Amino acid sequence: MIPVERRQIILEMVAEKGIVSIAELTDRMNVSHMTIRRDLQKLEQQGAVVLVSGGVQSPGRVAHEPSHQVKTALAMTQKAAIGKLAASLVQPGSCIYLDAGTTTLAIAQHLIHMESLTVVTNDFVIADYLLDNSNCTIIHTGGAVCRENRSCVGEAAATMLRSLMIDQAFISASSWSVRGISTPAEDKVTVKRAIASASRQRVLVCDATKYGQVATWLALPLSEFDQIITDDGLPESASRALVKQDLSLLVAKNE
């Protein structure tokens, strides 16, 4: 049986069962564990499946972005750990970008005492928090307002970002996989691509609960990022897949 035939069978089994173990696949196709792993890694790179401990499953699909209020109650411990680790990478006197989101808000909460810092953001909550609690210089992108996420999106925000020179961009996402970060909102894509182009260093900050999720629009491939910061809930198989792509992975320990 040639690889393309095996991979088609894998996709059919995953579609039927949702989650399939590696043992089931080796028995079904009478091939080695290593052969199946190579097939699964290829399918995961294509975004067709997600590797989990001992098996494989279909990628979850994000149909819409949760509101800011909903996101504040999700993965709070993980976001706090990621925020603390990410903030430790910021140097005094630098110009950084904090993407819209509650994970990046957690970064802001660890930066309030840093001297001579410039923070660019498209997030009203982050800007408001830093305005009340820090002495840093704040630059808001402006643009079309997304009420649900209390942030600015679209071409006007992207155009503003293209006029800046950013040292570090901390970029968030509602879904990510080995293919990259994706979003159900097309007007967020142009903003993420603009900040990626405007920044000297690009850091993805995303908790492990969002790994293996996909949405309609691929915003950025993982190859665009210099570092990825996530939490220790990321499956070992996912860590291996990311490291295999020569991606720099930092894992924040949940406290």
UniProtKB/Swiss-Prot annotation:
Residues 3-58 form the HTH deoR-type domain. One of its GO terms (biological process) is regulation of DNA-templated transcription. Residues 20-39 bind DNA. SUPFAM superfamilies: NagB/RpiA/CoA transferase-like, Winged helix' DNA-binding domain. Coiled coil: none annotated. SMART domains: DeoRC (SM01134), HTH_DEOR (SM00420). Pfam families: DeoRC, HTH_DeoR. The keyword Methyltransferase does not apply. InterPro entries: Carb_Metab_HTH_regulators, DeoR-like_C, DeoR_HTH, HTH-type_regulator_YgbI-like, NagB/RpiA_transferase-like, Tscrpt_reg_HTH_DeoR_CS, WH-like_DNA-bd_sf, WH_DNA-bd_sf. It comes from the Bacteria. One of its GO terms (molecular function) is ligand-modulated transcription factor activity. Keywords: DNA-binding, Transcription, Transcription regulation. PANTHER family: HTH-TYPE TRANSCRIPTIONAL REGULATOR SRLR-RELATED, REGULATORY PROTEIN, DEOR FAMILY. This is Uncharacterized HTH-type transcriptional regulator YgbI. It comes from Escherichia coli (strain K12).
